[in-house]
């Protein structure tokens, strides 16, 4: 079974081929594909040759390898199977089976087959090289020592799997191979190889010898391929090395005991017998010396450059250094070439891949050092070469062996080996034996046979590739079908579950409908039975129905009658309701008329009362006028008497008797004029005080009535709330209550109108009095003379008070004093009480002025009476009379009141004095807003106030 391991960076592509095709017992030699079939323009050691043609070939093949390794492994028409990767216990078992088959064939096969199979076994199990095929850099590693690291790092990118071997494993494998190299006692093959190649290079070899070494080279490549397949098996690396060591020891033991030698060993012996003692190339001893110590040196740098990504897949067979003569000769060839790196460059140049485009490379001459071992020696390569040195074709095949397995192998159709260019003619001194040429010819014949067999195997492999591709497609299709089947199973399961649920639901519905149908049938049967039973009672039911129908007709007639009666009752009730409404309206109208008539009656009564009061006031005024006339008469008589007394005094006086009559006449005239002016001023003051008294009384009465009205309204609202809260009242009581409220409101309106009328009357009276006073003053001013120095004031209340004391002393009685006290109490109890009491200090301040004029006037007549009178006039002018001040307005009020006759003897805090004082102050304060009354009414009131006797307190309110 052939395992071709392909590496593409980190991907592994493992292709299994049937074992009987490659490793059949009848195969004389193991075959690995000739590189000329796959890489027609391939050149070993790329980048190290001076020939441009070789460099071109090398770069082209490198590009092929790097760009598409899988495509390089097989021709483009082959089907690619990138994912056919089969590893594990199967491959390991296949490798074990391969070992058993080889051992079995060694026991029972022919000597030639045993020789080939033994080479295969030793190559697969006992090689000391690394377990992976080397790339370009590992091949270059064999040609030079110092620059090999650079070439390795530069050429390792296209491959990925060969970096996965541990460095320690590499060193162990190399060290395990060294004792076998030293213990091998076979003669060195390098000398014979180099010698025969050198001699043969001087003359063109015949075609049969060219084919025979090619066959050997191919057998060697096939051994490498077997080891490459063995790499792909999954075994531990150390165990592979140990097992390979054990197999190698067994093979050495068999070889030393006299078993059949391999073909390469015979070629080596023949070449040594003929040419070994004659020709000595420089440095064969050095090549031997490298056997012990120089062997592992190329392996270690190659192992050091590996990528530390872990070990590769473990395979059962490690390619180690062969103990067989084939492996030994290869090693010696390598070590010899290590001593001559300069010759290696020129040795590789003459062997390009056999192709028509590269035939001109054959002009290059051969070099004597044998570098074939270097190209075929893969110290770490899994395919050592055997007899490749005997022909340029075999050397070229072996030179391509390193890259052949480091890159994917393209399966190309085999090409003729005869296309290789003939080497240039060698020197005539070098000659080769006839046995060597015969061996080469046989080898080339075997190469042709094996090439044909390889072509057949390639065709079979292509068929297997096709089958594998089909199988892969079948697997994909099968996977797709399985996935579709799984999805179908899932959907079918789901549908079945849904169908089952629906079926259960429908079955339940069917059962329910069956039960319902059964119930309906039972009901129908019972209904039928009841119907059949009722048919017997049909006659009785019909008779009862007739009776009920007649009764129903009667009831309907009665119902109609009742409805008619009900309609009549409803109409009557509506008429009654309308009549009631009409009566209510008439009652309300009558009540309104009654209210109006009551209001008119009240107004008429008020007018009647007013007329009566006015008549009383008129009579009082008339009496007052009469009394005034009497008082004037008395005053006149008193003044006449005083005048007579003064005249007599002047007559009896001693001083100025002559001028006295002249003086007395104008002086008396002036005195009379002044007295008259005083009288007029006093009358004006009295009128003003009367007006103010009337205004104050009206204000007090209005305030009292307003307070009473507010209290009545409050009581009315309380009663309204209490009556609205009670539910048992009738509509008649509500009407009565509304009427009472209307009456009260009308009364209040009438009172307000009366008060306004009184105020207007008072204002009219005041203005009439003012007009009269002004007219009198204007007349007096026109009739005055130029004696204005004797007129200090228009009015002197002290004289008026003094003159009134004698005439009115006896006019005040005890009853009048009691009435005045009563009026004082009522005035103090009114709303304006606080205002009157607050002004009492004016009484105390002005009372000391009261006795002064009394004393002055009541004193006996003295010569200084006129002087004292003048003093009193000036003092009274400063502190009192007509200037609208409190003291000025006080004295005329005292003189005009009936109590002024006793004011001199009345204490300051007596109610007689307090009453007019408080009244005057209050009148002044109340007069400031301008409460006016009609002058006629005021004149009547002023005349009435001069009456010595007042009827009562109610009469005072009426006068107001």
Swiss-Prot record:
The modification Phosphothreonine is found at residue 906. GO terms for cellular component: bicellular tight junction; cytoplasmic vesicle; plasma membrane. The keyword tRNA processing does not apply. Signal peptide: none annotated. The keyword DNA repair does not apply. It comes from the Eukaryota. Residues 804-817, 898-911 have a biased composition (Polar residues). A motif (PDZ-binding) lies at residues 957-960. The modification Phosphoserine is found at residues 243, 271, 297, 722, 795, 807, 830, 904, 910. Residues 196-248, 277-317, 381-407, 413-432, 775-826, 842-952 are annotated as: Disordered. Residues 388-401, 845-870 have a biased composition (Low complexity). Polyubiquitinated by NEDD4, leading to proteasomal degradation. GO terms for biological process: actin cytoskeleton organization; angiogenesis; establishment of cell polarity involved in ameboidal cell migration; hippo signaling; regulation of cell migration; Wnt signaling pathway. Its main location: other. Residues 261-281, 440-641, 667-697, 731-761 form a coiled coil. It is found in: Cell junction, Tight junction. Inhibits the Wnt/beta-catenin signaling pathway, probably by recruiting CTNNB1 to recycling endosomes and hence preventing its translocation to the nucleus. Belongs to the angiomotin family. This is Angiomotin-like protein 1. The gene is AMOTL1.
């Amino acid at each position: 079974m052939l395992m071709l391991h392909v590496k593409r960076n980190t991907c592994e592509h493992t292709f299994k081929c049937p074992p009987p095709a490659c490793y059949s017992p009848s195969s004389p030699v193991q075959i690995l594909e000739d590189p000329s079939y796959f890489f027609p323009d391939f050149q070993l050691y790329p980048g190290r040759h001076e020939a441009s043609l070789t460099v071109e070939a090398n770069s082209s093949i490198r590009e092929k390898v790097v760009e598409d390794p899988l495509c390089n492994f097989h021709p483009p028409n082959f089907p690619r199977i990138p994912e056919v990767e089969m590893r594990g216990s199967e491959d390991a078992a296949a490798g074990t089976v391969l070992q058993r088959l080889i051992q079995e064939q060694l026991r029972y096969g022919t000597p030639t087959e045993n020789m080939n199979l033994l080479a295969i076994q030793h190559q697969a199990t006992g090689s000391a090289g690394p377990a992976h095929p080397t790339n370009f850099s590992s091949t270059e590693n064999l040609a030079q020592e110092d620059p090999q690291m650079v070439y390795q790092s530069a050429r390792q990118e296209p491959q990925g799997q060969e970096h996965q071997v541990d460095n320690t494993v590499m060193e162990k494998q190399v060290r395990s191979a060294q004792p076998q190299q030293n213990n091998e006692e076979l003669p060195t093959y390098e000398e014979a190889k180099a010698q025969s190649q050198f001699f043969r290079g001087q003359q063109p070899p015949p075609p049969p010898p060219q084919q025979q070494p090619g066959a050997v080279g191919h057998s060697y490549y096939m051994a490498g391929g077997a080891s490459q397949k063995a790499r792909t098996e999954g075994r531990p690396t150390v165990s592979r090395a140990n097992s390979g060591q054990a197999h190698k020891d067994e093979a050495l033991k068999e070889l030393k005991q006299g078993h059949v030698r391999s073909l390469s060993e015979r070629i080596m012996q023949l070449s040594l017998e003929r040419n070994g003692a004659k020709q000595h190339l420089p440095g064969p001893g050095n090549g031997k010396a490298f056997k012990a110590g120089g062997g592992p040196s190329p392996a270690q740098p190659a192992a050091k450059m590996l990528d530390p990504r872990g070990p590769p897949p473990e395979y059962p067979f490690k390619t180690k250094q062969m103990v067989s003569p084939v492996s030994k000769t290869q090693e010696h060839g390598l070590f010899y070439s290590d001593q001559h790196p300069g010759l290696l460059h020129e040795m590789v140049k003459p062997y390009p891949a056999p192709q028509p485009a590269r035939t001109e490379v054959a002009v290059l001459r051969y070099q004597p050092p044998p570098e074939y071992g270097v190209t075929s020696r893969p110290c770490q390569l899994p395919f050592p070469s055997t007899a490749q040195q005997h022909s340029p074709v075999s050397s070229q095949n072996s030179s391509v062996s390193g890259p052949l397995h480091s890159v994917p192998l393209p399966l190309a159709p085999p090409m003729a080996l005869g296309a290789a260019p003939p080497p240039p003619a060698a020197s005539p001194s070098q000659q080769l034996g006839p046995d060597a040429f015969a061996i080469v010819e046989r080898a080339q014949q075997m190469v042709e046979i094996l090439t044909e067999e390889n072509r057949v195997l390639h065709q079979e492999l292509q068929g297997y590739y096709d089958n594998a591709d089909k199988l892969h497609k079948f697997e994909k299709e099968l996977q797709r079908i399985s996935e579709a089947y799984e999805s179908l199973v899932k959907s079918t399961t789901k549908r079945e579950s849904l169908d089952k649920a629906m079926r259960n639901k429908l079955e339940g519905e069917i059962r329910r409908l069956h039960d319902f149908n059964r119930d309906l049938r039972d009901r129908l049967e019972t209904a039928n039975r009841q119907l059949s039973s009722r048919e017997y009672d049909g006659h009785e039911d019909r008779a009862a129905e007739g009776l009920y129908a007649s009764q129903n007709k009667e009831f309907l007639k009665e119902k109609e009658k009742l409805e008619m009666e009900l309609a009549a009752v409803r109409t009557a009730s509506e008429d009654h309701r309308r009549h009631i409404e009409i009566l209510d309206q008439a009652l309300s109208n009558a009540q309104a008329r009654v209210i109006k008539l009551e209001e008119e009656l009240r107004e008429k009564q008020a007018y009647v009362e007013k007329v009566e009061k006015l008549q009383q006031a008129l009579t009082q005024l008339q009496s007052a006028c009469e009394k005034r006339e009497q008082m004037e008469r008395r005053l006149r008589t008193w003044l006449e008497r005083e005048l007579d007394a003064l005249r007599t005094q002047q007559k009896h006086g001693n001083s100025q008797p002559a001028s006295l009559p002249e003086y007395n006449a104008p002086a008396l005239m002036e005195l009379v004029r002044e007295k008259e002016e005083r009288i007029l001023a006093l009358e004006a003051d009295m009128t003003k005080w009367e007006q103010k008294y009337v205004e104050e009384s009206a204000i007090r009465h209005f305030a009292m009535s307003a307070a009473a009205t507010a209290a009545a309204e409050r009581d009315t609202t309380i009663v309204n709330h209490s009556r609205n809260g009670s539910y048992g009242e009738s509509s008649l009581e509500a009407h009565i209550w509304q009427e009472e409220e209307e009456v009260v409101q009308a009364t209040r309106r009438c009172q307000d109108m009366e008060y306004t009328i009184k105020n207007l009357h008072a204002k009219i009276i005041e203005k009439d009095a003012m007009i009269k006073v002004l007219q009198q003053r204007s007349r007096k001013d026109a009739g005055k003379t130029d004696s204005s120095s004797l007129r200090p004031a228009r009015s002197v209340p002290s004289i008026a008070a003094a003159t009134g004391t004698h005439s009115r002393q006896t006019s005040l009685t005890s009853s009048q004093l009691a009435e005045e006290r009563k009026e004082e109490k009522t005035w103090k109890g009114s709303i304006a009480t606080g205002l009157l009491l607050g002004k009492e200090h004016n009484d105390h301040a002005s009372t000391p002025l009261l006795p002064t004029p009394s004393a002055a006037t009541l004193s006996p007549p003295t010569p200084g009476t006129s002087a004292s009178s003048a003093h009193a006039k000036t003092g009274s002018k400063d502190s009192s009379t007509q200037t609208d001040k409190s003291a000025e307005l006080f004295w005329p009020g005292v003189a005009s009141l009936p109590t002024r006759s006793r004011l001199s003897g009345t204490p300051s805090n007596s109610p007689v004095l307090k009453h007019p004082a408080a009244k005057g102050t209050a009148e002044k304060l109340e007069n400031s807003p301008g409460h006016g009354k009609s002058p006629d009414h005021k004149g009547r009131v002023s005349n009435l106030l001069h009456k010595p006797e007042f009827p009562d307190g109610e009469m005072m309110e009426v006068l107001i």
